[in-house]
UniProtKB/Swiss-Prot annotation:
The chain crosses the membrane at residues 12-32, 47-67, 81-101, 129-149, 172-192, 230-250, 261-281. Gustducin-coupled receptor for denatonium and N(6)-propyl-2-thiouracil implicated in the perception of bitter compounds in the oral cavity and the gastrointestinal tract. Signals through PLCB2 and the calcium-regulated cation channel TRPM5. In airway epithelial cells, binding of denatonium increases the intracellular calcium ion concentration and stimulates ciliary beat frequency. This is Taste receptor type 2 member 4. It is a multi-pass membrane protein. It is found in: Membrane; Cell projection, Cilium membrane. Belongs to the G-protein coupled receptor T2R family. CDD domains: 7tm_TAS2R4. Several bitter taste receptors are expressed in a single taste receptor cell. It comes from the Eukaryota. Residues 33-46, 102-128, 193-229, 282-297 are cytoplasmic. GO terms for cellular component: ciliary membrane. GO terms for molecular function: bitter taste receptor activity; G protein-coupled receptor activity; taste receptor activity. The gene is Tas2r4. Expressed in subsets of taste receptor cells of the tongue and palate epithelium and exclusively in gustducin-positive cells. Expressed in 15% taste bud cells in circumvallate and foliate papillae but only in 2% in fungiform papillae.
Length: 297
């Protein structure tokens, strides 16, 4: 029974990978065509383009790993380490890109008057390139910390130096673990905060429209509703994903196949699910997707 559950989850994960690869490839192609035609690219589309490329590479890497698992092909320890480090880097980069995208949506749509919020509103659009580079640097640093932690944990707890001095490695391990946890916690807090602020602001705007009989439903309001639905669905996918990612790491979870299967399906559902949501709520991507579906009907 447990083996059948694992096979089902594995097959579902591969299917979700295919969906995510197609969705992100669609985003990449449409944004490139728009970029070539208009000779310019907006800040949200630039971030979305970077996110789609990162997720395309991440899901492609997972698909390659699934092929290795399904065919029982032997691979060296170095290949496994390289695969894991690539996944850590791409996953961290995609999460930071999502954080920037959520912050951009939040400052563009909401109208809070807090000084910090106003500062973000003035600078975030102009600093898009710098923020994208910062995502790469932070992701590389996080991956390096993870690699250092994995290497240190292989050694004994105490190492004797040349002068017979005993070095306790627990302090170094705790420092690295704290750095990784703080990085994930910062991402989680920022994403939940930006999404919650946007949902709260849009809900107040819609309630105000309902009280004002003279207001009418316009394309801008429709875009705001799309952003609100996007953030609600994002939280539904992102919060379980963050919890499952943390629970998937401890060794006792690896021994529990049921818990491992649940974490695997949750982590596999988030990237393609969020990519599809981005297509549905983006007016250009949604229009192109409708044309493609109507053509093949």
């Amino acid at each position: 029974m447990l083996w059948e559950l694992y096979v089902f989850v594995f097959a579902a994960s591969v299917f979700l990978n295919f969906v995510g690869i197609i969705a992100n490839l669609f985003i990449i192609v449409i944004i490139i065509k728009t970029w070539v035609n208009s000779r310019r690219i907006a800040s949200p589309d630039r971030i979305l383009f970077s996110l789609a490329i990162t997720r395309f590479l991440t899901l492609g890497l997972f698909l390659l790993n699934s092929v290795y698992i399904a065919t029982n092909t032997g691979r060296s320890v170095y290949f496994s380490t390289f695969f894991l480090l690539c996944w850590k880097f791409l996953d961290a980069n995609s999460l930071w890109l999502v954080t920037i995208l959520n912050s951009l949506y939040c400052v563009k749509i909401t109208n809070f008057q807090h000084p910090v919020f106003l500062l973000l509103k003035r600078t975030i659009s102009m600093k898009t390139t710098s923020l994208l580079l910062a995502c790469l640097l932070i992701s590389a640093l996080t991956t390096l910390l993870y690699y250092m932690l994995s290497q240190i944990s292989r050694f004994p707890e105490h190492i004797i130096g040349r002068n017979d001095t005993s070095f306790d490695l627990s302090d170094g391990i705790l420092t690295l673990v704290a750095s990784l946890v703080l990085n994930s916690l910062l991402q989680f807090m920022l994403n939940v905060t930006f999404a919650s602020l946007l949902i709260h602001s849009l809900r107040r705007h819609i309630q105000k429209m309902q009280r004002n009989r003279t207001s009418f439903w316009n394309p801008q309001t429709e875009a705001h509703m799309g952003a609100m639905r996007l953030m609600i669905c994002f939280l539904v996918l992102y919060i379980p994903y963050s919890i499952a990612t943390l629970l998937y790491l401890p060794s006792y979870m690896r021994k529990n196949l049921r818990a491992q299967a649940i974490c695997m399906i949750i982590t596999a559902a988030y990237p393609p699910g969020h990519s599809v949501l981005l297509i549905i709520t983006h007016h250009k991507l949604k229009a192109k997707a409708k044309k493609i579906f109507c053509f093949y009907k």
